[in-house]
Amino acid sequence: MTKEDWEAVIGLEVHAQVSSNTKLFSSSSTEFGAEHNTQVSLVDAAMPGTLPILNYYCIEQAIRTGLALSAEINKYSYFDRKNYFYPDLPQGYQITQFFEPIVKNGRVFINDNEKEIRIARIHLEQDAGKSVHEESKTYVDLNRAGVALMEIVSEPDLRSSAEAAECMKKLRQILRYIGSCDGDMEKGSLRCDANVSVRLKGSSTFGTRCEIKNLNSIRYIVQAIDYEIQRQIEILESGEEISQDTLLFDVASGKTKVMRSKEDASDYRYFPEPDLLPVEVSQDKIDLIQSSLPELPDQKKLRYIEELGINEYDANVITSDKAIADYFEELIKKHDSKLAVTWLTVELFGRLNKAGIDIVSSPIKANALSELLDFIVDGTISAKLGKQVFDSMFETGKPASLIIEEQGLKQITDRGQISEVIDKIINNNQDKVQEYKSGKTKLYGFFVGEVMKLTKGKASPDVVNSILSERLSN
């Protein structure tokens, strides 16, 4: 048998940190990068006698996420205790939602909306702390302990690492659009576990799955899944059986390694959390959250294509990130969409890519670019000079109006002034005038170039063409 005879079956468990200033069951800050153990309440440290108090904002964000994924909202849900021991879990259990999650039966589309990936559930849970290893000692940092996570669990509908990566990107895109998670994988705000198994193509029976934990970049998701698929195929083709294990991905070697044998639900002894009341959500509350949802990326993309006439490629690029889409929306408040697309995707993106920064860090904000386009559209400067001004704006952060004034770039539109320049050029180049009139029309560009040279590029192209055509036709 060859690799082509096998089929991968993949499901994702995506852990998305709720964009909340405080934790799920305490008022401790969730700010990233604080000193170790400076954002820990008595509840987070599991001091005896302390009780959790639910941060209802996190419930609203989970509902918001569920609605964005076309899911069902459970009007009655509750929390459970997941019992296990780990040094950075001070309670000895994690408060999660096992029996009745807040959200179920959603979906997300990938492959240009051609494939539906079912979302089994979204539940809220608290994050654990972090073990910090230094030489022969290990320290525990509880700053993350109790931070609210949404666990978004997909059905095993993915069939390749590429599909898993696209699903992760699509979920991140939606989460950022609705504001329930910032999607920053570098800071740990978004990570996932991948459940991977293989089976012969055509089979409807699931193979033994292994879970790869804590994948925190799209690249690692692809590498880990690809390696694991190949590993399992080689084991099965050698006549051995897959062991149901929990794995870690070693970035240095590019291989998965066994962390522990995979647990079943019974190993965690789930039972309802006795210190928290069930969560009841009214239909009115659900409707209110639904009405507050912004235009989602697929809806926005369709609008750009159908209403603004933008091609599918550019629409994909612009809607890929909410910050880019917001920037574009600001531009088209005053300007033609095609002009905005060109300046955004060609001029701005070109400079951002060269500088290695994203649009959020751009030295040219949307209102500043819009002002520059005002000057180009009203003829104050030419499009060519506009690019020169744009470069200066990018380098200095100065507004277009100031740069135009400082560099004396205001376009010459006075017909009398331009006529004098053109007459001078024609008088000094009678031989070329005769050649032009005898059929060498390509010389027209020579005359335009001479006008621009003498006016230092400031002459209005429209006025130049109008007068020059008239002079050369006489």
Curated annotation (Swiss-Prot):
<dbReference type="GO" id="GO:0005524">
    <property type="term" value="F:ATP binding"/>
</dbReference>
<keyword id="KW-0547">Nucleotide-binding</keyword>
<protein>
    <recommendedName>
        <fullName>Aspartyl/glutamyl-tRNA(Asn/Gln) amidotransferase subunit B</fullName>
        <ecNumber>6.3.5.-</ecNumber>
    </recommendedName>
</protein>
<keyword id="KW-0067">ATP-binding</keyword>
<dbReference type="InterPro" id="IPR042114">
    <property type="entry name" value="GatB_C_1"/>
</dbReference>
<dbReference type="InterPro" id="IPR017958">
    <property type="entry name" value="Gln-tRNA_amidoTrfase_suB_CS"/>
</dbReference>
<dbReference type="Pfam" id="PF02637">
    <property type="entry name" value="GatB_Yqey"/>
</dbReference>
<dbReference type="InterPro" id="IPR017959">
    <property type="entry name" value="Asn/Gln-tRNA_amidoTrfase_suB/E"/>
</dbReference>
<comment type="function">
    <text>Allows the formation of correctly charged Asn-tRNA(Asn) or Gln-tRNA(Gln) through the transamidation of misacylated Asp-tRNA(Asn) or Glu-tRNA(Gln) in organisms which lack either or both of asparaginyl-tRNA or glutaminyl-tRNA synthetases. The reaction takes place in the presence of glutamine and ATP through an activated phospho-Asp-tRNA(Asn) or phospho-Glu-tRNA(Gln).</text>
</comment>
<dbReference type="InterPro" id="IPR004413">
    <property type="entry name" value="GatB"/>
</dbReference>
<keyword id="KW-0436">Ligase</keyword>
<comment type="subunit">
    <text>Heterotrimer of A, B and C subunits.</text>
</comment>
<dbReference type="InterPro" id="IPR018027">
    <property type="entry name" value="Asn/Gln_amidotransferase"/>
</dbReference>
<dbReference type="GO" id="GO:0050566">
    <property type="term" value="F:asparaginyl-tRNA synthase (glutamine-hydrolyzing) activity"/>
</dbReference>
<dbReference type="GO" id="GO:0070681">
    <property type="term" value="P:glutaminyl-tRNAGln biosynthesis via transamidation"/>
</dbReference>
<dbReference type="GO" id="GO:0050567">
    <property type="term" value="F:glutaminyl-tRNA synthase (glutamine-hydrolyzing) activity"/>
</dbReference>
<dbReference type="InterPro" id="IPR003789">
    <property type="entry name" value="Asn/Gln_tRNA_amidoTrase-B-like"/>
</dbReference>
<dbReference type="InterPro" id="IPR023168">
    <property type="entry name" value="GatB_Yqey_C_2"/>
</dbReference>
<dbReference type="InterPro" id="IPR014746">
    <property type="entry name" value="Gln_synth/guanido_kin_cat_dom"/>
</dbReference>
<keyword id="KW-0648">Protein biosynthesis</keyword>
<dbReference type="Pfam" id="PF02934">
    <property type="entry name" value="GatB_N"/>
</dbReference>
<dbReference type="GO" id="GO:0006412">
    <property type="term" value="P:translation"/>
</dbReference>
<dbReference type="InterPro" id="IPR006075">
    <property type="entry name" value="Asn/Gln-tRNA_Trfase_suB/E_cat"/>
</dbReference>
<comment type="similarity">
    <text>Belongs to the GatB/GatE family. GatB subfamily.</text>
</comment>
